[in-house]
Amino acid sequence: MTVLIHVLGSDIPHHNHTVLRFFNDTLAATSEHAREFMVAGEDNGFTESCPALSLRFYGSKKALAQAVIAKAKANRRQRFFFHGQFNTSLWLALLSGGIKPAQFYWHIWGADLYEVSHGLKFRLFYPLRRIAQGRVGGVFATRGDLSYFARQHPDVRGELLYFPTRMDPSLNAMAKERQRAGKLTILVGNSGDRSNQHIAALRAVYQQFGDTVNVVVPMGYPANNQDYIDEVRQAGLALFSAENLQILSEKMEFDAYLALLRQCDLGYFIFARQQGIGTLCLLIQADIPCVLNRDNPFWQDMAEQHLPVLFTTDDLNEQVVREAQRQLASVDKSGITFFSPNYLQPWHNALRIAAGEAE
């Protein structure tokens, strides 16, 4: 039997760390198909912190792709599980036959599915990538992303799967220590990545609430982002008074980030695709409602779990936000499909499907 190989095809430290830690701590002990990884980027201590995994690192996305293609050609029974897929060479290999459809299983992370960049090289590449995506052996994704993908590729198998957000289930029913009243605190975006469209989001928040709310913008990740942080701060200060705007430019440890989220009353996410599920989960767990773009299909996942959804096109005010908080507080968090530990069983199923051991 050939063991499934997992591929992290792009050097995205935060996401890669989350996946590797999840596999090491949760999946590797029970499945031999959860131990082999090929990773773009440097070790950065992963080998030491993930002793249950066999990790091979490659200095570039191209070097990793070449190694994957060589393995695929050497053994056509070798299957790969691609987590996110931000690697042009791998898509082209699927198009050219270097990797066969039966060897290619893909966990959609959102950004790798949607065609949102206006850069020329992306606009030229998107049609090729779209064709390649129709040739994969199967996909795993959120309900909304499965629906989006199926409209383009109805014949490709799709299975429900959620990114393994780091969560403590014991916090689901945690008593609220903070009385939710007074000035609203609004979280804008889930990171400092430009895909959060921070400036447009700040303008939208101002249009809805004016300079009457506290606005918190976490921008400590990714690194080397100071010019964009300054740009967002300047735009924010043109709208909000200094005491109402908090731009966080330092990377935060998980517990500190969790504490920050729990001080908020609302999450505001303007991007028109699925992303930031981890932050959404942590907000929902704390009974903090989220405002989504109606083009972000994750609203389908939330509605399926009977969670209140607010949209950027809604008329928002404190009364609407407090009512959404009340509705969230009445939900039994232990039954939410995309919460830990409920997302575990779909991962076990996904491993068996990608490895060819399940129909």
UniProtKB/Swiss-Prot annotation:
Compartment(s) of residence: Cell inner membrane
Keywords of the record: Cell inner membrane, Cell membrane, Glycosyltransferase, Membrane, Transferase
Source organism, top-level taxon: Bacteria
Catalytic activity: beta-D-ManNAcA-(1->4)-alpha-D-GlcNAc-di-trans,octa-cis-undecaprenyl diphosphate + dTDP-4-acetamido-4,6-dideoxy-alpha-D-galactose = alpha-D-FucNAc4-(1->4)-beta-D-ManNAcA-(1->4)-D-GlcNAc-undecaprenyl diphosphate + dTDP + H(+)
Single GO term (MF): 4-acetamido-4,6-dideoxy-D-galactose transferase activity
Membrane disposition: Peripheral membrane protein
Enzyme Commission number(s) of this protein: 2.4.1.325
InterPro entries on file: WecF
Statement: the UniProt record of this protein carries the keyword Calcium: no
Pathway where it operates: Bacterial outer membrane biogenesis; enterobacterial common antigen biosynthesis
GO term, biological process aspect, one: fucosylation
Recorded GO CC terms: plasma membrane
Its job: Catalyzes the synthesis of Und-PP-GlcNAc-ManNAcA-Fuc4NAc (Lipid III), the third lipid-linked intermediate involved in ECA synthesis.
Family indicated by similarity: Belongs to the glycosyltransferase 56 family.
Protein name: TDP-N-acetylfucosamine:lipid II N-acetylfucosaminyltransferase
Organism: Salmonella typhimurium (strain LT2 / SGSC1412 / ATCC 700720)
Taxonomic path: Bacteria, Pseudomonadati, Pseudomonadota, Gammaproteobacteria, Enterobacterales
Gene: wecF
